[in-house]
């Protein structure tokens, strides 16, 4: 039993990887062919020195004949591979040969594709985080500005209290400042008049002439 299990393991280890539409000849070459739809006949695609070349030839033929339902060896190369002019075996074979001769490092191509996808995903994530940060900063700044304006307004209301203005001087209890004495004290005409003006005071039919009084004031220094 132990010998049989070890033989199976050896056979599994010696098995060649399975490629779609590709076979390895005994002398080390790789051949590729594809069955035509709804027919028993096959389209011979050619003999190639490497498995990758034969696989690309098969992928071109499969996409041409089966369309989007084709199962490919290198789906990542589907947009880069050529297409036949028609579905005739000759044109399909020509396109397959052209694809096989194209210089593709499949391993490197897959690595570059994965790296590009990872980089794009990271950039999108960073851009999203950056937009969220900018949005948060803008909202925070707006909130802080609003709070500061409200605080300043409250402080001004507490500090500056303007006196109330009444409709007249009698209704107001505030102080009133006059720019000159003339605004405060009423000056009689006889005090503000010239020396030619005479003020006469009548009391019980008696009259007083104050012209001499004004005349005497002229002698004072």
From Swiss-Prot:
Low complexity composition-biased segments: 116-134
Residue range(s) of DNA binding per entry: 18-75
Entry-linked SMART domains: AP2
Top-level taxon of the source organism: Eukaryota
Residue span of region Disordered: 111-134
Location in or out of the cell: Nucleus
UniProt GO BP: ethylene-activated signaling pathway
GO MF: DNA-binding transcription factor activity; transcription cis-regulatory region binding
Keyword DNA-binding in annotation: yes
KW Kinase (keyword) present: no
Disulfides per UniProt: none
Principal location class: nucleus
Gene Ontology cellular component terms for the protein in this record: nucleus
UniProt keyword list: Activator, DNA-binding, Ethylene signaling pathway, Nucleus, Transcription, Transcription regulation
Entry's family note: Belongs to the AP2/ERF transcription factor family. ERF subfamily.
Purpose: Probably acts as a transcriptional activator. Binds to the GCC-box pathogenesis-related promoter element. May be involved in the regulation of gene expression by stress factors and by components of stress signal transduction pathways.
Name of the protein: Ethylene-responsive transcription factor ERF043
Origin organism lineage: Eukaryota, Viridiplantae, Streptophyta, Embryophyta, Tracheophyta
């Amino acid at each position: 039993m132990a010998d049989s299990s070890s033989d199976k393991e050896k056979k599994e280890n010696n098995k060649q990887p399975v490629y779609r539409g590709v076979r390895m000849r005994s002398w080390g070459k790789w051949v590729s062919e594809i069955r035509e739809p709804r027919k028993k006949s096959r389209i011979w695609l050619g003999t190639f020195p490497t498995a990758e070349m034969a696989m690309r030839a098969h992928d071109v033929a499969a996409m041409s004949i089966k369309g989007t339902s084709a199962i490919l060896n290198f789906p990542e190369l589907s947009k880069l591979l050529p297409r036949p002019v028609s579905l005739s075996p000759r044109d399909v074979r020509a396109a397959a040969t052209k694809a096989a001769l194209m210089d593709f490092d499949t391993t490197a191509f897959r690595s570059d594709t994965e790296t590009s996808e990872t980089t794009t995903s990271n950039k999108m994530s960073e851009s999203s985080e950056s937009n969220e940060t900018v949005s948060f900063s803008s909202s925070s700044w707006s909130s802080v500005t609003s709070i500061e304006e409200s605080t300043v307004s409250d402080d001004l209301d507490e500090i500056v209290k303007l006196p109330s203005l009444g409709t007249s001087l009698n209704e107001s209890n505030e102080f009133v400042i006059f720019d000159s004495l003339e605004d405060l004290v009423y000056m009689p005409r006889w005090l503000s008049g010239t020396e030619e003006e005479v003020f006469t005071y009548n009391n019980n039919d008696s009259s007083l002439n104050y012209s001499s009084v004004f005349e005497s004031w002229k002698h004072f220094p």
